[in-house]
């Protein structure tokens, strides 16, 4: 039984509430109460309610009145919390984010948002917690002390065992090994309360035992989807342009083709015909500059390969589905 969910961004909150209603048969009122839109840095208000005027101005319309006045404690009441799952935003730790920031994200406050997660664990004292983030967390060092040491010390100070800072490199898992057709690496940190009957090593053994040698590919994921064909001429629909139409009568929600501009089509054709996926990094960066006139330190173009998992779908591609 999930007692509560906390998210900061409204689209994620809306998605969770919708799933509780449509999938788990909660009433809309219960879903509105159990999914909280709030800033976890304001832990006292999160726990106890009685929100400040500033918090009400920002979050009141997005939350149930019980949450505003009684906080998370009022939602959970006296029920025992067995498990907390979460983690801070990944932007400060991601290698891509650090490469783009003039200070390598060393001055970014999000380096320290794990402290709010620690406070939540300390407040509710679960038997276990699961903390996940990008592998860049293991090398992030916004001050004199690497983040992984800060995290270890923080959880140790509130009575929880996690892997040591040097052992955490063995806690990086790839989604491909768990039946997902996309390469996405994450650090998974299990925490066990000292004195608990649970053993830390048992959770990592269980996770490792779920690994599979079977690799799911782009073809496995998308091969049976209805196909599209290009229109003779793009058309205007609402405020956007449409360049493709679905073949056949099978319609799957959100299965739509992004508009392909003439430049897009040229890039696709050249990239595939010249096998640019296997060109050198310099060649691919130069090609991007030739097309856009913009210099980049990151490879922006890549064709998905039918017989392999997809590379990580980065967050700016959310608009493409």
Q: Predicted segments — roles?
A:
Residues 23, 197-198, 321:
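Substrate-binding/catalytic groove segments of enzymes
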Residues 85, 188-192, 314:
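Short, well-ordered beta-strand micro-motif
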Residues 1-124, 135-148:
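Core alpha/beta nucleotide-donor-binding catalytic domains of modification enzymes
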Residues 82, 118, 187, 299, ...:
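Residue-level detector of short, conserved catalytic/binding motifs and their immediate flanks
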Residues 215, 288-321:
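Class I SAM-dependent DNA methyltransferase catalytic core
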Residues 6-7, 132, 315-316:
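Short His-Asn-centered micro-motif
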Residues 74-78, 93-292:
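Class I S-adenosyl-L-methionine
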Residues 3-5, 35-37, 162, 170, ...:
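Conserved beta-strand scaffold positions in the cores of enzyme catalytic domains, especially
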């Amino acid at each position: 039984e999930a007692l509560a969910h906390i998210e900061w961004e409204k689209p994620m909150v809306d998605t969770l509430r919708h799933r509780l209603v449509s999938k788990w048969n909660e009433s809309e009122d219960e879903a509105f109460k159990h999914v909280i839109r709030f800033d976890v840095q304001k832990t006292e208000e999160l726990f106890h309610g009685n929100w400040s005027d500033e918090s009400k101005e920002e979050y009141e319309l997005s939350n149930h009145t019980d949450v505003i006045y009684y906080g998370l404690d009022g939602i959970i009441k006296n029920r025992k919390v067995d498990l907390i799952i979460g983690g801070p935003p990944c932007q400060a730790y991601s290698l891509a984010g650090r490469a783009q920031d003039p200070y390598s994200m060393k001055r970014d406050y999000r380096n320290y948002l794990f402290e709010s997660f620690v406070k939540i664990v300390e407040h509710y004292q679960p038997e276990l917690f699961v903390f996940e983030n990008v592998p860049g967390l293991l090398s992030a060092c916004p001050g004199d002390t690497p983040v992984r040491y800060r995290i270890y010390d923080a959880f140790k100070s509130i009575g929880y065992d996690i892997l040591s800072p040097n052992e955490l490199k063995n806690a990086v898992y790839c989604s491909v090994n768990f039946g997902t057709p996309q390469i996405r690496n994450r650090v998974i940190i299990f925490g066990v309360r000292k004195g608990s009957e649970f053993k830390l090593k048992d959770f990592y053994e269980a996770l490792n035992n779920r690994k599979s040698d079977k690799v799911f590919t782009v073809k496995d994921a998308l091969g049976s989807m209805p196909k599209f064909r290009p229109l003779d001429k793009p058309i205007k629909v609402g405020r956007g342009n449409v360049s493709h139409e679905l073949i056949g009568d099978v319609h799957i929600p959100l299965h739509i083709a992004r508009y392909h501009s003439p430049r897009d089509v040229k890039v696709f054709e050249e990239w595939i015909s010249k096998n640019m996926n296997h060109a050198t990094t310099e060649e691919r960066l130069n090609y991007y500059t030739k097309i856009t006139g913009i210099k980049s330190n990151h490879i922006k173009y890549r064709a998905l390969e039918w017989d392999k998992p997809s590379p990580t779908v980065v967050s700016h591609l959310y608009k493409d589905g």
